[in-house]
């Protein structure tokens, strides 16, 4: 029952915040909970969902290459500007943080609750996008490790 109340609260916050992605995600999870025998599928979705999401995002990012909107000239041009180098550096940093984030989420489930709350606040109050829980977890890992803190 508690999970339904929590999901309903998330749905209300998403509706109030006009965040269609969070509304859709919450409704999908609620529908999955309603369907008999899906309890065994939920852990699979939880475990593999981030990878599936990254795959979908990667496909979307590669489409301009496939359509010819982005080519090698654009790639070389990126290395000619400071902004291009910063973008490459941030891409590397995000990949590294995500690696630690995935490990952190698996090792310390309590982090998930705080990250979900932070993500909801960021999405609803600041019109952010819920694309960063793994990165946020990686950042949490780095700060917690740096400050020698524990959950």
Curated annotation (Swiss-Prot):
It is found in: Cell membrane. Keywords: Cell membrane, Membrane, Transmembrane, Transmembrane helix. GO terms for cellular component: plasma membrane. Its main location: membrane. InterPro entries: UPF0756_TM (IPR007382). It comes from the Bacteria. Pfam families: DUF441. The keyword Transmembrane helix applies. It is a multi-pass membrane protein. The chain crosses the membrane at residues 4-24, 52-72, 77-97, 115-135. Belongs to the UPF0756 family. This is UPF0756 membrane protein Lreu_0946. The lineage of its organism: Bacteria, Bacillati, Bacillota, Bacilli, Lactobacillales.
């Amino acid at each position: 029952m508690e999970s339904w109340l929590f999901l309903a609260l998330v749905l209300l916050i998403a509706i109030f915040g006009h965040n269609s992605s969070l509304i859709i995600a919450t409704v999908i999870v609620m529908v999955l909970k309603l369907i008999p025998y899906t309890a065994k599928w939920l852990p699979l979705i939880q475990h593999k969902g981030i990878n599936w999401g990254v795959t979908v995002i990667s496909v979307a990012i590669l489409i301009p290459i496939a359509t010819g909107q982005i080519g090698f000239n654009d790639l070389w041009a990126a290395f000619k500007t400071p902004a291009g180098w910063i973008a490459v550096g941030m891409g590397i940093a995000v990949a590294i943080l995500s690696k630690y984030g995935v490990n952190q989420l698996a090792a310390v489930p309590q982090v998930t609750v705080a990250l979900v709350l932070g993500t909801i606040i960021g999405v609803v109050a600041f019109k952010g996008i819920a694309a960063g829980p793994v990165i946020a977890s990686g950042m949490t890992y780095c700060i917690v490790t740096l400050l020698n803190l524990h959950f």
